[in-house]
C-alpha cells in the first residue's frame, strides 16, 4: 500500500509538472490590477501591466507653437516640452512663409515707389518751355502764312535764318498756326449753321436795327449776334499776338528754346 501510494503521488507530481511545462508564459503572469478590463495578450500595456498614459498637447508641440494656438506663454511659466519632428517642420514652414511674405510685400512697395518716381519724371519731361517770339518775328511769320500754309525745307531754312530762329521753332509755329486756323474755320461754320436756323423775319429785324444804328452814328449798342467777336479774326489781324494763343489745343506742339 505504501509503495502504491508513493507511486500515485509521484505520478501526480509528474503530471502537474508536465501541465506547468505545457502552460505558456502568459498563463504565469499575475492578474491585472483592474479585473473589469479584459485581457488582451497582444497588448504591451496588458503584458507589462502598466496603466495607459495620455499624452498632452505639450508633449507634441513646442511652447512657441502652443502660444500661437492657446495664447498662453509656456516658456514664461517655466514649462518646457519636447518638440516633435512634425511641430518642428510646422514651425520652420511658418517662419519660411512669413519671410517670403515680408519679402514680397517689400518688393511690391519698392516697385510702387519706382513707378511713382518714373511717372513724376515722365510728367516733368512732358512740360516744355514756350518760345517767346518778338512782335517782328510774329509779323513776318503771319505775313508768310497768308500765302503759304506749308513750308518747304528751303523756305523753312530761309525764314529761320532771316528771323534768327531754329528750324524746330519755325515748324512749331506753322503747325500751331494751322491748328488755330482750323479751329477758326470750324467756329465760322458753326456760326453759319446757327444763322441758317434763325427765321427770315428775325434776320430782317436784325438788319433793320443795324441800319438804324448806322444812321444814328453807331451810338447804340451792338447786337451780340453781329458783334465782331462772334466771328473769327483774319490771319492778318493776329499780328502782335504771343505764341501762347497759338498753343491752346493738344494737337499743337511745343519745343525748347
From Swiss-Prot:
Residues 1-43, 206-257 are annotated as: Disordered. CDD domains: homeodomain. Residues 245-257 have a biased composition (Acidic residues). GO terms for cellular component: nucleus. It is found in: Nucleus. Disulfide bonds: none annotated. Disruption phenotype: Morpholino knockdown results in circling swimming behavior at the larval stage. Reduced fin bud formation and loss of myod1 expression in embryo hyoid muscles. Disruption of cuboidal morphology of adaxial cell pseudo-epithelium, and failure of myod1-expressing cells to incorporate into the adaxial cell layer. Slow muscle fibers are abnormally shaped at 24 hpf and 48 hpf and fast muscle cells form shorter myofibrils at 24 hpf and 48 hpf, in addition unfused fast muscles cells are present at 48 hpf. Residues 1-46 are annotated as: Required for convergent extension movement and hypaxial myogenesis during gastrulation. Required for the formation of thick and thin myofilaments. Required for myod1 expression in the pectoral fin bud. Required for continuous expression of cxcl12a in the posterior lateral mesoderm at the tail bud stage and in adaxial cells at the 10-somite stage. PROSITE patterns: HOMEOBOX_1 (PS00027), HOMEOBOX_2 (PS50071). Pfam families: Homeodomain. Its main location: nucleus. Residues 126-185 bind DNA. One of its GO terms (biological process) is muscle cell development. The keyword S-adenosyl-L-methionine does not apply. Keywords: Developmental protein, DNA-binding, Homeobox, Nucleus. InterPro entries: HD, Homeobox_CS, Homeodomain-like_sf, HTH_motif, LBX_TF. One of its GO terms (molecular function) is sequence-specific double-stranded DNA binding. Residues 233-243 have a biased composition (Polar residues). It comes from the Eukaryota. Interacts (via N-terminus) with tle3a/gro2 (via C-terminus). Transcription factor required in several developmental processes. Involved in axis formation during embryonic development by inhibiting tle3a/gro2 from binding to tcf7l1a, thereby facilitating ctnnb1-mediated transcription of canonical Wnt/CTNNB1 signaling target genes. Regulates convergent extension movements and hypaxial myogenesis during gastrulation by activating non-canonical Wnt signaling via wnt5b. Required for the formation of myofibrils and fusion of fast muscle precursor cells, potentially via transcriptional regulation of genes specific to thick and thin myofilaments. This is Transcription factor LBX2.
Amino acid at each position: 500500500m505504501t509503495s502504491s501510494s508513493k507511486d500515485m503521488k509521484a505520478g501526480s507530481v509528474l503530471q502537474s509538472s508536465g501541465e506547468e511545462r505545457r502552460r505558456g508564459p502568459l498563463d504565469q503572469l499575475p492578474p491585472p490590477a483592474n479585473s473589469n478590463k479584459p485581457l488582451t495578450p497582444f497588448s504591451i500595456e496588458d503584458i507589462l501591466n502598466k496603466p495607459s498614459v495620455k499624452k498632452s498637447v505639450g508633449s507634441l508641440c513646442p511652447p512657441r507653437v502652443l502660444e500661437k494656438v492657446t495664447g498662453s506663454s509656456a516658456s514664461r511659466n517655466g514649462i518646457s516640452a519636447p518638440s516633435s519632428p512634425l511641430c518642428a517642420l510646422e514651425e520652420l514652414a511658418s517662419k519660411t512663409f512669413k519671410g517670403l511674405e515680408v519679402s514680397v510685400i517689400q518688393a511690391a512697395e519698392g516697385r510702387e515707389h519706382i513707378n511713382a518716381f518714373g511717372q513724376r519724371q515722365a510728367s516733368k519731361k512732358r512740360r516744355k518751355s514756350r518760345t517767346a517770339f518778338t512782335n517782328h518775328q510774329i509779323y513776318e511769320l503771319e505775313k508768310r502764312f497768308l500765302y503759304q500754309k506749308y513750308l518747304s525745307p528751303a523756305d523753312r531754312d530761309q525764314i529761320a535764318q532771316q528771323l534768327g530762329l531754329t528750324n524746330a521753332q519755325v515748324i512749331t509755329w506753322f503747325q500751331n498756326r494751322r491748328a488755330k486756323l482750323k479751329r477758326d474755320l470750324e467756329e465760322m461754320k458753326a456760326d453759319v449753321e446757327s444763322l441758317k436756323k434763325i427765321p427770315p423775319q428775325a434776320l430782317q429785324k436784325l438788319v433793320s436795327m443795324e441800319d438804324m444804328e448806322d444812321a444814328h452814328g453807331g451810338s447804340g449798342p451792338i447786337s451780340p449776334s453781329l458783334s465782331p467777336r462772334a466771328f473769327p479774326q483774319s490771319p492778318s489781324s493776329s499780328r502782335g499776338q504771343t505764341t501762347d494763343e497759338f498753343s491752346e489745343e493738344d494737337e499743337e506742339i511745343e519745343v525748347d528754346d
